[in-house]
Curated annotation (Swiss-Prot):
It holds the Pfam family FGGY_N. ADP binds at T14, R18, T268, G311, G412, N416. Key enzyme in the regulation of glycerol uptake and metabolism. Catalyzes the phosphorylation of glycerol to yield sn-glycerol 3-phosphate. GO terms for molecular function: ATP binding; glycerol kinase activity. Belongs to the FGGY kinase family. It comes from Streptococcus uberis (strain ATCC BAA-854 / 0140J). Sn-glycerol 3-phosphate binds at T14, R84, E85, Y136, D246. ATP binds at T14, T15, S16, T268, G311, Q315, G412. This is Glycerol kinase. The lineage of its organism: Bacteria, Bacillati, Bacillota, Bacilli, Lactobacillales. The gene is glpK. InterPro entries: ATPase_NBD, Carb_kinase_FGGY, Carb_kinase_FGGY_CS, FGGY_C, FGGY_N, Glycerol_kin.
């Protein structure tokens, strides 16, 4: 009898790396997680040691094998999903990074982005890449490293250096330098990739003086990129055959294959992505246009809205205000609130994300009375997450012309039933919470498995990640719109207060 085969997903995140082994039913068999240090050289700067990331990945691969007793030879394929935009540049010969990885959150390259805006390149960048000019994306991070590491520009021009986002770095390491590749979803977040023509954009490269020689080859999200070097995978030469940035991987893991399907991941922040199909739709309302995934010779585009503060608002209640001891307590406290007062917490602790993009805004609270209780305040904080999601969903419907019928949800805060019910109420649509909340890793596993025939096709996946719970809207229309109107007033007042 032959041994059962599995798919391994490597989920490389901002604070930790994970390896998860899935079976053919999409069930998690084993997982391992390891955190790694965050580096803060100056206020607003965030960096990682790329070698520490690689070491953490090696550690969790071993951990998953130890936990499961599965052998490397039983892994049919590997899928990789990763923190997006984070930038590594390394020496092609030695494999050593020439500087720390600059993390997506880091603002150290903001002056480069500001200069591009001042020079009038906003429309050009938007039309070609679907993005806004921001330090968030990889392009300014590459330019910063080439400017600040002595001799780096010259070495890049000679072809001695390589650039990659974290997916590229991990594939290069796992294959022992045999493959220097990225995928559509990660390339689309560099601010260098023309998402319409599906190629690195010569005009933008010239504008930023970034040599094309350092860039990886861009591949689809589901194909064999290379095989693990045996000494990096405990003797196994296993195909690496699926890759996607974390939010796009979650879109795929949520089985959002049709235009108009939308998923939201309630993590530290909230990332809402809508599949818009094979037509690229540029947002006119401050959403990002990006590539969802490319598979079977087709590319599917997406609209994305990023909310900076979601689950971290609950952490603030716990660590900052000390109103709760654990995050799950927030639900019980909010349920105990008996007030109908319209209290609004606008958690703009680091500014407002989509669709406002106001980096000067700061947190505010409206509607407090002498009778306001801790329970009321916790409920208002939870509701702020749902209001922000509605801001993005309404904008997506305007941009796409698609009437959204359902929101598929995952992430830690999606386990909060009160939040999910209020989300359904304030949107007036169904909220479908996945039974398996490991949708990001599952998406990477699905992409890898499809490429090697482990799963036959998209239809064969649809029965694997069924809905765990459906939340249906129950609030009447006038109450819903009255509450949301109050939220819009609170956000407007918050922005006015932030004006200089």
């Amino acid at each position: 009898m032959s041994e059962e085969k599995y798919i391994m997903a490597i989920d490389q995140g901002t604070t930790s790396s994970r390896a998860i082994i899935f079976n053919k039913k999409g069930e998690k068999i084993a997982s391992s997680q390891k955190e790694f240090p965050q580096i803060f050289p100056q206020a607003g700067w965030v960096e990682h040691n790329a070698n520490q990331i690689w070491n953490s990945v090696q550690s969790v691969i071993a951990g998953a094998f130890i936990e499961s007793s599965i052998k490397p030879g039983q892994i049919e394929a590997i899928g990789i999903t990763n923190q997006r935009e984070t930038t590594v540049i390394w020496d092609k010969k030695t494999g050593l990074p020439i500087y720390n990885a600059i993390v997506w959150q880091s603002r150290q390259t903001a002056p480069i982005a500001d200069q591009l805006k001042e020079d009038g390149y906003t429309d050009l960048i938007h039309e070609k890449t679907g993005l806004v000019i921001d330090a968030y994306f990889s392009a300014t991070k590459i330019r910063w490293i080439l400017d600040h590491v002595p001799g780096a520009q010259e070495r890049a021009e000679k072809g001695e250096l390589l650039f990659g986002t974290i997916d590229t770095w991990l594939v290069w390491k796992l294959t022992d330098g045999a493959a220097h590749v990225t995928d559509y979803s990660n390339a689309a977040r560099t601010m260098l990739y023309n998402i319409k023509e599906l190629k690195w954009d010569e005009e933008i490269l010239k504008l930023l003086n970034i040599p094309k020689a350092i860039l990886p080859e861009v591949k689809s999200n589901s194909e064999v990129y290379g095989k693990t070097a045996a000494f990096h995978f405990y003797g196994g030469e296993v195909p690496i055959s699926g890759m996607a940035g974390d939010q796009q991987a979650a879109l795929f893991g949520q089985l959002a294959f049709e235009p108009g399907m939308v998923k939201n991941t309630y993590g530290t922040g909230s990332f809402i992505i809508m599949n818009t199909g094979e037509d690229m739709q540029l947002s006119e309302n401050n959403l990002l246009t990006t590539i969802g995934y490319g598979i079977n010779g087709k590319v599917y585009y997406a609209l994305e809205g990023s909310i900076f503060i979601a689950g971290s608002a609950i952490q603030w209640l716990r660590d900052g205000l000390r109103m709760i001891e654990t995050s799950p307590e927030s639900e019980a406290l909010a349920l105990a609130s008996t007030s109908d007062d319209e209290i609004y917490v606008v958690p703009a602790f680091t500014g407002l994300g989509a669709p406002y993009w106001n980096s000067n805004a700061r947190g505010s609270v409206f509607g407090l009375t002498r009778g306001t209780t801790k329970e009321d305040f916790v409920k208002a904080t939870l509701q702020s997450i749902a209001y922000q999601v509605r801001d993005v969903i309404d904008t997506m419907q305007i941009d796409s012309g698609i009437d959204i019928q359902q929101l598929r949800v995952d992430g830690g805060a999606a386990m909060n039933n009160l939040l999910m019910q209020f989300q359904a109420d304030i949107l007036g649509i169904d909220i479908a919470r996945a039974k398996n909340l490991e949708t990001t890793a599952l998406g990477a596993a699905f992409l890898a498995g499809l490429a090697v025939g482990y799963w036959e096709d998209l239809d064969s996946l649809k029965e694997l990640n069924e809905t765990g719970q459906l939340f249906k809207a129950s609030m009447n229309e006038s109450r819903k719109e009255k509450l949301y109107k109050g939220w819009k007033k609170a956000v407007m007042a918050t922005q006015i207060f932030a004006e200089e």
